[in-house]
């Protein structure tokens, strides 16, 4: 997931309705809606969610589940088969809503999340949410937030340690700053050493530590919030 290279700069490309645009030797044709893509570097692209992405998410949720050991793992421990089935159904419905919302975006719509493509392959996503002064998640409509927290997941381990997360979050941060986000945070738990290292690499510093609030695989860990300092 991490590389020694410095975070790359990003450029934003808007694909207008019924417009065929060539981006770095790749021709992309989008009909009937506005689509936004951010070229984080030559290999990493941030883009809006598509209908065909839902199949990937179902696979990641049910088969290729290693990522659940690291991304809020306390949500996945001890679930019954009935609970898994119910939550999967709700998740698929939520994915459908995201696709529907994305289909209504205009060129001025501010995105709170992007899918991540690596060399044209859908490998993950990054998202953002508002937090309050105690670093708890707020409803998106709340106007009294401390700032916006960002998160990322590269689901398949084979795509980690390729600099994907570094490039994707750099592009996402640039996008959020360009659209008015003044304070940017990221949150994780003290057992996720890769995410901590990534946050520090990108210029985040520890802002808040909540001792012992996470229990993962029999261990007790701290909840961490980092703030971007540059």
Predicted segments with their positions:
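Conserved acetyl-CoA-binding loop-helix of GNAT-fold acetyltransferases
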Residues: 161-175, 197-201
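Conserved beta-strand-loop-alpha-helix junction that forms the acyl-donor binding cleft
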Residues: 155, 186-196
